[in-house]
Every structure is written in structure tokens, then in C-alpha cells.
Regions:
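N-terminal Rossmann-fold cofactor-binding loop
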Residues: 29-33
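Active-site regions of enzymes building and remodeling cell-envelope glycoconjugates
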Residues: 38-50
Length: 165
């Protein structure tokens, strides 16, 4: 099975891939710390902003599963670009009805208080569901607490503890 991990993938480690996707070919977009490993069937690349190049990856690999890690999984994470990346990936999924997509996001959309962040999270969830309905892509949204890491330099807690040293 070929799996694409995209979005806020700085938290993805080789161990996570081995445990979560044994015997799968895994393409990771956006994690600059993870190195490709042919023996373990891991290809790691920076996120591709050029739609033509992203299309070539979708033509090269026949992804059956896509896991998109939202920027909202990082506490005080970067909010720009998420909707565009989601749109690009979902647009390329329309040719393959067998793809299953899991969108991992934060819990902001379930809060009763409306803010800019809750609106953006809700909009991203709506984009995933609408594209899923429009192209008959099996999509699931999983709301989870914030992720944290002692090695991912973009992580809020990593920055906090580094400054405290």
C-alpha cells in the first residue's frame, strides 16, 4: 500500500512510520528533519508548492491512504497556507476513488467561542468534507489535542523550553 503523509509532518518520525504503516511505501511531504530511507520504503520531501510537481507525485504513486496533519495540531502554529495545501491534495485525489483520507486537526472547531482560529479550523474541515462529497473521496476528520515534540523546531513547547535553557 502507498501512503502519503502531508501537512504539518514535523512530528512524524521514522519510528512512527514503521509502527503505523508497516510494509507500506510512505511518502512524507513537509518534514525537513526526516531523511528518506529506501530500505524502509520512506521518501521524505519538502512540501511541494508547485501544483505540477505535486501532480507528478500523484501520478508516480497510487496512494491508497492520505493522512494530512493540520497546522492547528501545533499550539500557536502557523495558520497560513493550510486551505491551499488541502485544496491541492484533494483536487488530485478526484481521479482515484479508492483513496481514503484522514484529516488530523485540533479541537478548536468544537469550542463555543468564535475566534479567527475557530473559523479557520472550521473552514478547513468544511473544505475536506465538501471535496470528499464532491469527488466521492472517503474522508474522515479526527480532532485530537495538540501535538508536542522535544526535537521539532517549529513546536511551541520546543521553543519554550529552548528559551528557558
Amino acid at each position: 500500500m502507498e501512503v502519503l503523509l502531508a501537512g504539518n509532518t514535523g512530528y512524524v518520525t521514522e519510528t512512527f512510520i514503521e509502527e503505523s504503516f508497516p510494509e507500506c511505501d510512505v511518502v512524507v511531504l513537509g518534514n525537513e528533519m526526516l531523511k528518506s530511507n529506501r530500505k524502509k520504503n520512506i521518501l521524505s520531501r519538502p512540501f511541494i508548492k508547485d501544483e505540477k510537481e505535486l501532480k507528478e507525485i500523484f501520478e508516480t504513486y497510487e496512494f491508497e491512504r492520505i493522512v494530512y496533519f493540520s497546522n492547528y495540531l501545533t499550539m500557536h502554529g502557523r495558520m497560513t497556507g493550510e486551505l491551499e495545501q488541502l485544496r491541492q491534495i484533494l483536487q488530485l485525489c478526484k481521479k482515484n476513488k479508492e483513496i481514503r483520507m484522514l484529516y488530523l486537526t485540533g479541537q478548536e472547531s468544537i469550542y463555543n467561542i468564535t475566534s479567527g482560529k475557530t473559523l479557520l479550523v472550521s473552514a478547513a474541515e468544511n473544505v475536506v468534507m465538501e471535496y470528499g462529497n464532491m469527488y466521492q473521496i472517503n474522508t474522515k476528520i479526527l480532532r485530537i489535542p495538540h501535538l508536542y515534540s522535544a526535537v521539532y523546531t517549529q513546536d511551541f513547547f520546543y521553543k519554550l523550553f529552548t528559551e528557558a535553557e
